[in-house]
Amino acid sequence: MADRRNRCNQILLLAYQSFGLVFGDLSISPLYVYKCTFYGGLRHHQTEDTIFGAFSLIFWTITLLSLIKYMVFVLSADDNGEGGIFALYALLCRHARFSLLPNQQAADEEISTYYGPGDASRNLPSSAFKSLIERNKRSKTALLVLVLVGTSMVITIGVLTPAISVSSSIDGLVAKTSLKHSTVVMIACALLVGLFVLQHRGTNKVAFLFAPIMILWLLIIATAGVYNIVTWNPSVYKALSPYYIYVFFRDTGIDGWLSLGGILLCITGTEAIFAELGQFTATSIRFAFCCVVYPCLVLQYMGQAAFLSKNFSALPSSFYSSIPDPFFWPVLMMAMLAAMVASQAVIFATFSIVKQCYALGCFPRVKIVHKPRWVLGQIYIPEINWVVMILTLAVTICFRDTRHIAFAFGLACMTLAFVTTWLMPLIINFVWNRNIVFSVLFILFFGTIELIFVASALVKIPKGGWITLLLSLFFTFITYVWHYGSRKKYLCDQHNKVPMKSILSLGPSLGIIKVPGMGLIYTELASGVPATFKHFLTNLPAFYQVVVFVCCKTVPIPYVPQKERYLIGRIGPKTYRMYRCIIRAGYKDVNKDGDDFEDELVMSIAEFIQLESEGYGGSNTDRSIDGRLAVVKASNKFGTRLSRSISEANIAGSSRSQTTVTNSKSPALLKLRAEYEQELPRLSMRRMFQFRPMDTKFRQPQVKEELFDLVNAKDAEVAYIVGHGHVKAKRNSVFVKQLVVNVAYSFLRKNCRSPGVMLNIPHICLIKVGMNYYL
C-alpha cells in the first residue's frame, strides 16, 4: 500500500512539473488559432454554423492527433524513457541495421540498457521488409534524410515559437492602447533578446515558477471559456458533433479547406510533449494532459466560438476581445509570462535535439555546456543560441504580422508530426513486432488526416510558409553534409589503417626510440591501428613507452551506465605495451568537465591487465573479438588493483617550471607561460595523484612489471595525439561531390569547434598530426 501511495505521489509530482516544460507551446495556441483560421476567403463566411464548424474541427483535431495519436501511441514508443525524433531513429537502429555508420560492434549489444526488459525482437527472424531495408543503402539513406528533415523542423520550430508566442501575447496592446504596431514589434524584440541573453545562466533559479505560471494560465483561459459559453451562446456544445464539420465544408467549399492551415495551429507543441518525455514519464504526462490541459483547451476554444458566434467583428483579435475588460491587463501579463515559459521550453528542446544530432554524427562540433547546479539534462549551446536569436529577431521584424509567422509555424509543426507518423509504422513492425497490418492501418488513418493538413499548409507558402522551407532546407543540408563527410572520412580511415602484420614485424620497440610517458592517440576507428600513428612515426621516429588508442563513440541508446563505458583491449603481444580504449556514450549523455579521465583510464587498463592474467571468464567479460581487440568490461573488483596517493614531486616540478619561464625575457616563452598558466589548474589536478600497484601477490611477475610500467608512464607524462585532417574530394569525383566535400564540408570543419576542445584536452598536452584525406 505504501509503495502504491509513493508511486501515485511521484506521478502527481512529475505531472505538476511537466506543465512548465511540456505543455507551454500547446497551451498558448488559443492566442492565434481563430485569428489565423478566419483569414482570407473564410472572412466572407461569418455565420454561426461556420464558427461552430471551425470549433468542431479544432476539437476533433486535438482529440485525434494530440490525445489519441500522441498520448496513446507515440508516447509508448519511448527509448528507455526518452522521446523525440532521434529516439525513434535510435530504436530502429538498435532493432535493425539501419545505421549508416560502420563503427558499431557486437559488444555494444551487451550493454544492459541496449534492449528493453522482455525485449525478444533480437531473437526473432528478420522479415522480408526489414531485410530489404537493411540490404538497400538507398533505403537507409532515405530513412536518415527523413529523420534529418524532422530534426531540421525541430530547429525551425525553435526559431518560430519564440517569435509567434511573444508577438501574439502582446498583440492585445494594439487594440487596447494607442501604441503603433511597430512599437509593439520593438517590445517583442526586446523581450526576445532578454530571453536569449539569459540562456547561459540556466533556469535552475526560476524553473520552479514555470509550472505554477502554466497551471494558472490554463485555469484562466478555461475560466474565460466557461464565462463566454454561459454569457454568449450556451448551445455551442452542439459543435462537438462532427456533423458541423460537414456543414462547415459544405458552406465554405475551397475556402474552408484553405483555412485548415489555421486550424492545425491548435496542435502546435504536441510534438514537444514527446520530445520532453525523458524529463518525466509517459504516465505523468498522460495524466496532466487528460485531466487538465485537454479539458482547459477545449473549454477555451469552445468559449471563443461562443463569443465569436455573436461578435463576428472581433475575429481579427478574437482572444483578447473575448476577455472581459476588467481582466484584460492581468490576462495580458499572464499571457506574456506563459509565452516566455513556452519559448524557454522550446529553446531547451532545440539545444537537446542539436546535442543528439551531434552525438550521432549529424551535426558539426559545437560547445555543449552543462553546469552541476543546473537541472539534470539541461544544456546550453552558445552557437545555436545566438543563431536562433538572430533568426527569431529577423522573423519578428520582417513579418510583423503574427498570422504570417503562424502559417510558417503551422507548416513546420505539421511536417514534423508527419515525419513521426511515417516512423511509427516501422516502430510498430520492427520494435513492437506487431503485424504489418497494424502499421498500414496507423499510417492510413493518421497519415491521411495529416496529409490533408500539410497540403493546406503548403498553400500558405507565399504568405509566410516559405521561411519554414528555407530554414528546414538550410539545416537539413548542414546535417546531411556533415554526416556524409564524416562517414566518408571514417571509411577512408578504415581503408588506410595500418595492417597488424606491419606492426608485429617491427618488434616490441616498433623500430623507434621509446621515451618515458603515455601517448593517447585519438581515433574514430573501433578496431585496427590508424594511419595517424604511422604518419607520426614516419616524421618523428620516437614515441612514448605506453601507447593507448582511444576511440570515443556514441551508441544509439540514451545513456550508457558508467561502469560499462570503458572497453579495454590489447594490441599485439604484451611486450608492446599497446592498448585500445573504447569510450562509449549515449546520445543524451553529457560529458563531464572533470579532470579524472586519466585516472579512470589507468585504472581501467590496470583492471584489464589483471583480469587477463587471471583468465577471468565471468559475466563481465565480453568474449567477442574485434580484430585483435578482446573487449573486457569492468568487474566488481574495479579500482582495487592500484592505490592512489598525492604526488608532491609533480606539484614541485610545476612550480620550478613556472619559475624558470617567469625569469625568461623571451617573448615566445612569455606567451607560452600565459597559455601554461591558463591550463595549470587543470593540469595540476590531473597530475597531483600517483598510482602504485596494491600490495598483493601476483601469480605472474610479468603482470606486476606491466602494471609498474603503466603507472610510471602515467606519472612521467601524458600526451594527447589528435589527427588534424585536410579533406578533399578525389580528382575524378563528380562535380556535386567536389562541391559538397571541398566547399560545404570543409567550411563546416574549419568553422566548428576543434576535436581537442570537444574532448576537453589540455592545450599544452595536445599534439596535432597533419593528415590528408581524399574522399
Curated annotation (Swiss-Prot):
MF term (GO), any: potassium ion transmembrane transporter activity
Ranges in the topological domain labelled Extracellular: 32-54, 165-177, 227-253, 308-327, 400-407, 457-463
Positions in the Cytoplasmic compartment: 1-10, 76-143, 199-205, 275-286, 349-378, 429-435, 485-775
Modified residues (Phosphoserine): 647
Membrane disposition: Multi-pass membrane protein
Cellular component GO terms, alphabetical: plant-type vacuole; plasma membrane
Location relative to the cell: Cell membrane
Keywords of the record: Cell membrane, Ion transport, Membrane, Phosphoprotein, Potassium, Potassium transport, Transmembrane, Transmembrane helix, Transport
One Pfam family of this chain: K_trans_C
An individual GO BP term: cotyledon development
Transmembrane spans: 11-31, 55-75, 144-164, 178-198, 206-226, 254-274, 287-307, 328-348, 379-399, 408-428, 436-456, 464-484
Organism: Arabidopsis thaliana
Function statement: High-affinity potassium transporter required for tip growth of root hairs.
Consequences of knocking out this gene: Loss-of-function mutation results in the arrest of root hair growth.
Name listed for the protein in its UniProt record: Potassium transporter 3
Tissue: Detected at very low levels in roots, stems, leaves and flowers of mature plants.
Family indicated by similarity: Belongs to the HAK/KUP transporter (TC 2.A.72.3) family.
Transmembrane among keywords: yes
Phosphoprotein among keywords: yes
